[in-house]
Regions:
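Conserved beta-strand hairpin/beta-sheet module of binuclear metal-dependent hydrolase folds
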Residues: 34, 155-158, 250-305
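Feature representing long, continuous alpha-helical segments
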Residues: 96, 100, 111, 115, ...
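Short polybasic/polar patches that bind polyanions
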Residues: 31, 53, 187, 299-300
Length: 321
């Protein structure tokens, strides 16, 4: 619409007007979302692009991402402690790696498959570090959830903020409920989620190197062995994250771990062949420290079963988990 007006275009080029309007919308969205890390990342990336356009300069995609990373860390240093920080920037970095600078044009479906492949494979180390889980059906979930939420739910919800359009909010709710129903159905599939221990640091670093090697330029049409030579070697570097267990007590050693269970107690005692849990921590209304703290710790350490559990007394801060 801006381009159709000679008066407006002469005073402010349409490209500058578009990026300025986009920046305002991104800022409003970030405010509404509580400045969540993905919203901050998008806002700062768009701000870098806007500055480059207004100054008549080109800005590389990696430079835009680097500046966004810098501003997020500068303004919110504690953001690096959140899994969303690493997953958000990691996903965008992977998308850039698999799409930016590639020679030749490909079909949109091929491009989408490449992006899904990169994200699914590339986020494995982070998912294992933070959650000790890998959603095996995430490509299918993303294929359904991302378009519906991005193109339907979010626009309808933002439009409903305007009082005259609040009547469309139930429609957004229905679409979101439909998406959640599908996601719950996918999560009920057997082996929908791979669960394991937290890999040692060296295996994480090896996996990252292996994944980057596998994502080097190649051809989907020509198979995994096409393109950059020996990309299959990346699989070798990835495998240790699944096989190598964390450090375990040696014979004759006793390891005691006091878990941060709030106003309560949960202690894990381990030897080379046995694991005992002393107290389970408190309960938290609909949830408890057992599912939130104790079980993730045991899973992360590669402990599949307890040899014994001792509850010192029946107070909820010791037995609520």
């Amino acid at each position: 619409l801006w381009r159709r007006s000679a008066y407006l275009t002469l005073r402010l080029p349409a490209r500058r007007a578009a990026v300025a309007a986009g920046l305002v919308v991104a800022l409003a969205y970030a405010v509404l979302s509580g400045f969540a890390i993905p919203a901050q990342r998008t806002l700062y990336m768009l701000a870098v692009v806007a500055i480059a356009i207004w100054r008549g300069r080109q800005s590389a995609a990696t430079t835009v991402l680097a500046w966004a990373l810098f501003w997020v860390v500068l303004l919110d240093p504690w953001a690096v402690m959140a899994p969303g920080f690493w997953l958000s920037f990691g996903a965008i970095g992977l998308i850039m790696l698999i799409t930016v600078g590639r020679i030749g044009r490909v079909h949109w479906l091929t491009d989408w498959l490449r992006v899904q492949w990169a994200i699914t494979l590339g986020l494995i180390p982070l998912l294992l570090v933070f959650f000790q889980q890998i959603p095996m059906l995430s490509p299918f979930a993303n294929a359904i959830a991302i378009p519906l939420i991005s193109l339907v739910v979010v626009p309808l919800t933002l439009l409903a903020v305007i009082p005259l359009f609040d009547f469309i909010l139930p429609l957004a709710h229905e679409v979101l409920s439909f998406v959640m129903t599908i996601l719950h159905a996918l999560s009920d599939f057997p082996q929908a989620v791979w669960q394991q221990h937290t890999p040692p640091l060296w295996t994480i670093l090896a996996a990252i190197c292996g994944i980057l090697w596998m994502l080097l330029p190649g051809s989907l049409a020509g198979g995994f062995f096409a393109g950059f030579p020996a990309r299959w070697l990346g699989v070798v570097a990835l495998l240790p994250v699944f096989w190598v267990l964390p450090a375990q007590p040696k014979s004759g050693e006793l390891w005691l771990t006091i878990l941060d269970a709030g106003q309560g107690l949960a202690v894990v005692a381990r030897t080379a062949h046995h694991t005992v849990l002393f107290d389970t921590g408190p309960g938290f209304g609909d949830t408890d420290s057992g599912s939130r703290i104790v079980v993730p710790f045991l899973r992360g350490e590669g402990i599949r079963k307890l040899d014994a559990m001792v509850v010192s007394h029946a107070d909820t801060d010791h037995s609520g988990g």
